[in-house]
Design a protein with these regions (language model features):
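Glycine-rich adenosine-cofactor-binding loop
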Residues: 1-18, 30-35
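NAD(P)-binding Rossmann-fold cofactor-contacting core
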Residues: 19-47
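A short helix->loop->beta-strand "cap" motif at the edges of active sites that frequently abuts
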Residues: 23-24, 88-91, 114-115
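Short acidic-hydrophobic, aromatic-tinged amphipathic segments that line or gate anion-handling sites
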Residues: 52-62
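Rossmann-fold NAD(P) dinucleotide-binding segment
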Residues: 61, 65, 77-92, 105-108
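An anion/phosphate-binding loop that grips the pyrophosphate of nucleotide cofactors and donors
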Residues: 66-67, 114
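Short glycine-/small-residue-rich Rossmann-like dinucleotide-binding loops
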Residues: 68, 74-76, 97-98, 122
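Adenosine-phosphate binding glycine-rich loop
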Residues: 99-176
């Protein structure tokens, strides 16, 4: 799993991912040059599994390249992931940050890879810049958003296509 953002939210997303899935390596990328030695040690201790390595990545590209699941947990106003559809293809992207219309973590390349985004609540389309900006620019239509409750109430199928990119935009509802 790759984590963009070495703050409290990133810490707990990494921890939860390791509980929910069989993760062998957590790749952490932070946009600043802050020394993450203590952060990585605390995360490794909290995960409490000697089979899970915690690795700091120098670039977002390195983190994305090495990760199947990517969680973005930043207050950025610019995309934190590379705008490279080849790098993003086949990834599961979970965007946790971007909680105002001015914030943005996810690049436009995502819309070349998927025509749908899973959301918790309809107001995500207004609240998050990751959705409101692409809607305003015509790259995303509100009809392309799928409520997680609707998806889960259906008969969700396991995604077996390794090239399929999935995108979930969270606005902070703790259920998902």
């Amino acid at each position: 799993v790759g984590i963009a953002g070495a703050g409290v939210q990133g810490f707990y997303q990494a921890l939860y991912a390791c509980v929910a899935r069989p993760i062998d390596t957590v790749y952490v990328y932070n946009h600043s040059d802050r020394d993450l030695t203590d952060y990585l040690a605390r995360l490794e201790k909290a995960i409490d599994n000697p089979d899970v390595k915690v690795v700091q990545c120098k670039t977002a590209e390195e983190m994305v390249k090495n990760s199947e699941i990517i969680c973005t947990t930043t207050p950025s106003t610019q995309p934190v992931l590379p705008d490279d559809k080849d790098l993003l293809e086949g990834k599961c992207i979970i965007a946790i940050g971007s909680y105002t219309p001015e914030m943005r973590e996810i690049p436009d390349a995502i819309w070349d890879l998927t025509n749908e985004v899973y959301i918790e609540l309809p107001y995500a389309c207004e609240e998050s810049g990751d959705l409101s900006q692409p809607i305003k620019d015509g790259r995303l239509k509100e009809e392309q958003t799928i409520l997680m409750s609707d998806y889960l109430a259906g008969n969700p199928q396991e995604i077996t296509d390794p090239k399929k990119t999935t995108y979930f935009k969270s606005v902070g509802m703790g259920l998902f």
